[in-house]
């Protein structure tokens, strides 16, 4: 209960909750649209999705501040690769929120001289770059974690006077792939924050990929990805120890 209270008291927590609701509506709407007699339910879900999306706009200032703070923190990272990737990713995220704010200003009628499609495409590009850079950082962290697991395993097998598993694997492609996937599984299992961050970024990137026409998805896939990403984000907000730390 304390974790939930702390979660809802944070701007990031409320935004994740609204976001999860929005993508749940999108997913349910996609599943129910082909079914006869569900028109009213689909319409209600569409209205709720729109209302929640509009409500999330009020968290914009908090998101911008959070992105700026994240940029300042990433600059001081000791490792070059995370420092470079996270700084550029957070800068792109700040620009994305600025573009999103400009779109919001147009949508509420404060100005009419804004090209909606142009700014929407700009926002999607910067969001895509932010997620792509975050995934590069995740891949780098995964490679380091896999090296640690390999070394630890080799030490244990050496102390037990056994031949290391990694040197006994046959060179056939299928066995190599199995060994790699097993190592990847063990690496992520031992580092839950890295697993959460990777899953979150992979799910999030589906949306800009679709908007930019790089890889088309249906609303069901985007809704499911957004829901999974939101749940992962909610976990990191409620339990800060599950957030991937910057070294």
From Swiss-Prot:
Topology Lumenal: residue spans: 106-219
Maturation and modification: Seems not to be N-glycosylated.
Cytoplasmic side: 1-83, 240-247
Annotated Gene Ontology cellular component terms: peroxisomal membrane; peroxisome; protein-containing complex
Segments crossing the lipid bilayer: 84-105, 220-239
Principal place of residence: membrane
GO MF term list: protein homodimerization activity
UniProt keyword annotation of Manganese present: no
Organism lineage: Eukaryota, Metazoa, Chordata, Craniata, Vertebrata
Alphabetical keyword list: Membrane, Peroxisome, Peroxisome biogenesis, Transmembrane, Transmembrane helix
Region (Required for homodimerization, interaction with PEX11G, and peroxisomal localization): 220-239
Quaternary structure annotation from Swiss-Prot or TrEMBL: Homodimer. Heterodimer with PEX11G. Probably interacts with COPB2 and COPA. Interacts with PEX19. Interacts with FIS1.
Top-level taxon of the source organism: Eukaryota
Any Pfam family matching the protein: PEX11
Topological type in the membrane: Multi-pass membrane protein
Biological processes, Gene Ontology terms: brown fat cell differentiation; peroxisome fission; peroxisome membrane biogenesis; peroxisome organization; regulation of peroxisome size; signal transduction
Species for this entry: Homo sapiens (Human)
Role noted for this protein: May be involved in peroxisomal proliferation and may regulate peroxisomes division. May mediate binding of coatomer proteins to the peroxisomal membrane. Promotes membrane protrusion and elongation on the peroxisomal surface.
Entry annotated with the keyword Ion transport: no
Record localization: Peroxisome membrane
Name by which UniProt lists this protein: Peroxisomal membrane protein 11A
Family recorded in the similarity comment: Belongs to the peroxin-11 family.
PANTHER family linked: PEROXISOMAL BIOGENESIS FACTOR 11, PEROXISOMAL MEMBRANE PROTEIN 11A
């Amino acid at each position: 209960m304390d974790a939930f209270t702390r979660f809802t008291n944070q701007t990031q927590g409320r935004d994740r909750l609204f976001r999860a609701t929005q993508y749940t509506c999108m997913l349910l709407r996609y599943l129910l649209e082909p079914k006869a007699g569900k028109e009213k339910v689909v319409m209600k879900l569409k209205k709720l999705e729109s209302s929640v999306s509009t409500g999330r706009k009020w968290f914009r200032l908090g998101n911008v501040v959070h992105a700026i703070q994240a940029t300042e923190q990433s600059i001081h990272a000791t490792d070059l690769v995370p420092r470079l990737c996270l700084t550029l990713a957070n800068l792109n995220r700040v620009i994305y929120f600025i573009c999103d704010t400009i779109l919001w200003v147009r949508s509420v009628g404060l100005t009419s001289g804004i090209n909606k499609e142009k700014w929407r495409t700009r926002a999607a590009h910067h969001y895509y770059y932010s997620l792509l850079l975050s995934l590069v950082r995740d891949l780098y962290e995964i490679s380091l974690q896999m090296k640690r697991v390999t070394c630890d395993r080799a030490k244990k097998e050496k102390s037990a006077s056994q031949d290391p598993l990694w040197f006994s694997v046959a060179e056939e492609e299928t066995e190599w792939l199995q060994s790699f996937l097993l190592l990847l599984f063990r690496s992520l299992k031992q580092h839950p924050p890295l697993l959460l961050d990777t899953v979150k970024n992979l799910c999030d990137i589906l949306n800009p990929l679709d908007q930019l026409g790089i890889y088309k998805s249906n609303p069901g896939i985007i809704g499911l990805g957004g829901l999974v990403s939101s749940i992962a984000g909610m976990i990191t907000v409620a339990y800060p120890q599950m957030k991937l730390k910057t070294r």
